[in-house]
Curated annotation (Swiss-Prot):
InterPro entries per UniProt: CXCL16, CXCL16_dom
Region annotated Disordered, chain positions: 105-186
Short name of one Pfam family: CXCL16
Membrane-spanning ranges: 201-221
GO cellular component: extracellular space; membrane
Name of the protein in question: C-X-C motif chemokine 16
Organism: Sus scrofa (Pig)
Signal peptide start and end residues: 1-24
Similarity-based family: Belongs to the intercrine alpha (chemokine CxC) family.
Changes after translation: Glycosylated.
């Protein structure tokens, strides 16, 4: 036997020794449906184990002749026809158990205190400052009469029954605020108008400056061109002399 075949055979034996055998249809650890714990049909789980499975169940998987329940720290398998297996699958399918159900319940319990609100007391309407104080009194009382209040409530009466001085000061304050707001608005309008006029004048001045610059450049170019032409074609001196007829008498 060649040496490489011997090494290959020893390697295959070593790998086979590392892989643990499966238990019936359970499959090995390298299979598609492994189980960390197999519960026999003759010894179903206790109530404590069932509560643990209902609470921490992530999902389940149908294998050949059993069902595998996946937990956070391993998997538990049971026969497909076992009563506890059928109950656990039905509970998980209805959403009544499992980790998803536990998270939903915890979320609802967290939202419950936030949704519970203390009923707010109705706010008392503020007194109307534009009407006299007598309009806030009941119609059965005369303007000169004062409402009878129980003893120990003088401060509450002062707060609930506004006086004419308070109304007058409130009206004066509101009128002063209105006049001040009107003056501020007029001043703001003037400032806006001045700003708009200045912003409209800037483009006009810029356009005039550009026109003046272009005109100056054009005049400079024309003068330069005329000077060059006069240098290239000097004037004929004979054109400046006019022939004069000779005097016969002389």
């Amino acid at each position: 036997m060649p040496l490489w075949e011997l090494w290959f055979f020893l390697l295959a034996l070593f790998l086979a020794w590392l892989t643990p055998p499966g238990n019936g249809n359970e499959g090995s650890m390298a299979g598609s449906c492994p189980c960390n714990r197999r519960i026999s049909s003759h010894s179903p789980p206790t109530d404590h184990d069932m509560r643990h499975l209902r609470k921490y169940l992530n999902h389940y998987q149908h294998c050949t002749s059993y069902v595998r329940f996946q937990l956070p720290r391993g998997s538990v398998c049971g026969g497909s026809s076992d009563q506890w297996v059928l109950k656990l699958m039905g509970c998980f399918d209805r959403g009544e158990c499992g980790r998803a159900h536990a998270r939903t319940v915890a979320h609802q319990q967290h939202l419950a205190p936030q949704n519970t609100r203390v009923p707010e007391l109705p706010e008392r309407a503020p007194p109307d400052s534009s009407t006299p104080a007598q309009t806030n009194l009941p119609s059965t009382l005369q303007p000169t009469q004062k409402p009878t209040l129980p003893e120990g409530m003088p401060s509450l009466a002062k707060k609930l029954i506004p006086t004419s001085e308070t109304d007058t000061s409130t009206v004066g304050h509101s009128l002063g605020a209105k006049s001040e707001a009107r003056e501020n608005q007029e001043q703001l309008g003037k400032n806006v108008g001045a700003t708009a006029g200045t912003s409209a004048l800037v483009p006009v001045l810029s356009l005039l400056v550009i026109i003046f610059l272009l005109t100056g450049v054009l005049l400079y170019v024309m003068c330069k061109k005329r000077q060059e032409q006069s240098r290239q074609y000097p004037p004929d001196p004979q054109l400046h002399y006019v022939p004069v007829a000779s005097n016969i008498n002389t």
